[in-house]
Amino acid sequence: MSLELVLSCVPTERKNEYIGKIFKGCSHDEIKEYITMLNLYFKTEGSIQKTSELMYVHKNTLQYRINKLKEISGYDVRKPGESAALYIAMRIALDLDY
């Protein structure tokens, strides 16, 4: 069973609630920026160097954004036990066309 199948069973209202909890206080544009960052981060298997290159930002800028997301969400994408929550949020946001 894939994550897409599981998420397809979740009502849109619940998906929006989850996004709101993870990205509390963020504007739609800020959420889009975090989703882009997370998508590239996961595609590069957590490589700060590769992600920063793809985003055309310095590694320190990316680290700052990752730390900012940790402050907002309470989850650190660099920790395997916490990254799952952010991965699910990213997949939901992409499904909702953020």
Regions inferred by a protein language model and the residue ranges of each:
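Cytosolic nucleotide-utilizing catalytic cores of signal-transduction proteins
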Residues: M1-Y98
